[in-house]
């Protein structure tokens, strides 16, 4: 006789198995989308690659758009793990801001995503295509700019950056330099782009830093050592 406890255990096992399958699907989807674009994702392609039935994939994602949105969110989780969390131990203010910049460049440099920055690629693919996928990518890009802006404000409150600096402007400049490095590396294979970006960001931070703040930024030698360690 099947007891309630056994039914519950069987249900939990099935759910766990289903979640493992979903995560395996998303891992493959992120890898494909990072290099070939979100439009390169199809239920049929993933089913073949993972040796699953199409109906099995439809059980997890009812449409291509659902799959794309889930893939974007999976990439966001990876980004948080690889870029945001490593900065938690940095001191508030300029050390944290510089760490965000350095780790972001390192995440592209290390090839966390096969196609460089996942969100730079997704933004280029969907920026002229209104809809839920574009909206989600835009929302995540805004989160990143807000994170940089918050770090700038923290540095100003700690009296490490000049208070006449516009946080939104500085965040925009940093992001532009990072995106430029990603573009140069992906399109031209220019590994020096990361050094140039780090030099430019560090110079911009030094230019806006107070006397206290300037002592918290790495020297050129330390910065280059950091960049080499991430290759």
Kindly give the residue locations of the regions a language model identified:
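Basic, helix-initiating cap at the start of DNA-binding domains
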Residues: 1-36, 40-49, 66-69
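N-terminal intrinsically disordered/low-complexity leader segments
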Residues: 1-20, 211-231
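Short hydrophobic/aromatic patch on the recognition helix
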Residues: 50-61
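Hydrophobic alpha-helical connector segments
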Residues: 70, 84-115, 167-174, 216-221
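Amphipathic alpha-helical packing segments from all-alpha helical-bundle domains
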Residues: 80, 95-98, 102, 131-157, ...
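Amphipathic alpha-helical segments used for helix-helix packing
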Residues: 96, 111-132
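Amphipathic C-terminal alpha-helical segment
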Residues: 107-110, 154, 174-192, 204-213
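Hydrophobic alpha-helical segments that form the core
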Residues: 115, 120, 147, 163-184, ...
């Amino acid at each position: 006789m099947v007891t309630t406890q056994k039914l519950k255990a069987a249900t939990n096992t099935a759910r766990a198995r289903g979640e493992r399958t979903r995560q395996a699907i998303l891992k493959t989807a992120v890898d494909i989308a990072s290099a070939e674009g979100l439009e390169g994702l199809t239920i049929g392609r993933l089913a073949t690659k993972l040796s699953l039935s199409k109906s099995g994939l439809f059980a997890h994602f009812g449409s291509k758009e659902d799959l794309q949105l889930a893939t974007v969110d999976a990439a966001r989780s990876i980004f948080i793990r690889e870029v945001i969390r490593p900065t938690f131990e940095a001191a508030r203010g300029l050390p944290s801001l510089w760490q965000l910049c350095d780790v972001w460049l390192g995440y592209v440099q290390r090839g966390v995503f096969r196609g460089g920055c996942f969100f730079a690629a997704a933004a280029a693919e969907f920026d002229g295509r209104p809809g839920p996928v574009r909206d989600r990518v835009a929302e995540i890009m805004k989160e990143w700019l807000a994170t940089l802006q918050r770090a700038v404000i923290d540095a100003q409150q700690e009296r490490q950056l000049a208070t006449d600096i516009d946080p939104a402007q500085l965040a925009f400049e940093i992001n532009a330099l990072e995106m430029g490095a990603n573009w140069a590396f992906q399109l031209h294979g220019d590994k020096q782009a990361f050094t140039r970006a780090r030099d430019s960001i560090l110079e911009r931070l030094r230019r806006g830093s107070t006397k206290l703040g300037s002592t918290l930024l790495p020297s050129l030698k330390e910065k280059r050592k950091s960049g080499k360690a991430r290759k």
